[in-house]
């Protein structure tokens, strides 16, 4: 079951042959984590979605307020009998018609949901998580790279590369050969009490969890926080590297090429993140 424009319906009732999201990737989306019926960081997700729609010149329905978004997500979760935690995808796509040039900028939306086992964030303390660079394709330094659109070929081919090479993830680089993010999350690097993450202007996703971690880190005593470009060479001198996204929270990287990393700061930040959620 899905939520299609505010109506709960079966997936089989949706036609794809004229759907612009399917035909041209003419769609933007948000991945949400819901805990006990509440969207985590709902306001941040809502305003990023609205900004993304404006960037691609997609009309925002007048009725689609943040309260409406929360209500529609809750309606679907209830219909699917999901009571604890779930992963939700909210996708907006331009209405059918036209080729590359649409005949309208009006939009529609679909919401899907699936159960998550863990409501709070965690990672397995002694597990390995190995990454390497994905160099077949680059992410360009432009505004479109910072939004969650359905054009994800770099991430798809990178995921296949990671799978074929026994890696847990890959790090993406931009056209200036700087590391900007992982396949499905932002990246942070710790070196000598300085925490660095690439700026959005480098082409990384304007991540919701990135924003939360930056805010928590800036309140952490003795920790310098900076948004600056990261070269692949700098990664090999780091003390810790971790990935952030709204579903996983924080995922420490344990190995990049021959270098192995700790997770002390990642562990501290994830505890503070869970406190933030409980206080929510």
Question: Language-model features: where?
Answer:
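Helix-start/capping segments and mature chain N-termini
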Residues: 1-75, 98-280
């Amino acid at each position: 079951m899905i939520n299609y424009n505010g109506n709960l319906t079966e997936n089989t009732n949706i036609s794809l042959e004229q759907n612009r999201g399917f035909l041209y990737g003419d769609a933007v989306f948000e991945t949400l984590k819901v805990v006990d019926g509440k969207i985590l960081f709902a306001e941040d997700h809502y305003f990023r979605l609205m900004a993304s729609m404006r960037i691609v010149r997609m009309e925002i329905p007048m009725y689609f307020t943040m309260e409406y978004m929360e209500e529609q997500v809750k309606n679907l979760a209830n219909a699917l009998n999901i009571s604890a935690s779930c992963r939700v995808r909210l996708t907006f796509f331009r209405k059918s018609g036209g080729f590359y040039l649409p005949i309208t900028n009006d939009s529609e939306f679909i919401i899907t949901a699936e159960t998550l086992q863990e409501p709070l964030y965690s990672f397995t303390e002694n597990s390995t998580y190995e990454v390497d660079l994905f160099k077949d394709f680059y992410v360009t330094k432009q505004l479109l790279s910072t939004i969650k659109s359905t054009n994800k070929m770099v991430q798809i081919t990178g995921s296949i590369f990671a799978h074929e090479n026994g890696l847990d993830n890959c790090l993406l680089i931009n056209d200036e050969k700087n590391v900007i993010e992982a396949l499905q999350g932002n990246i942070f690097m710790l070196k000598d009490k300085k925490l660095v993450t690439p700026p959005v202007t480098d082409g990384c996703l304007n991540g919701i969890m990135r924003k939360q971690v930056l805010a928590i880190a800036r309140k952490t005593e003795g920790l310098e926080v900076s948004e600056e470009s990261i070269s692949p060479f700098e990664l090999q001198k780091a003390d810790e590297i971790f990935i952030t996204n709204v579903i996983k929270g924080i995922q420490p990287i344990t190995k990049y090429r021959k270098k192995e990393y700790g997770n002390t700061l990642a562990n501290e930040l994830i505890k503070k993140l869970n406190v933030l959620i409980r206080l929510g």
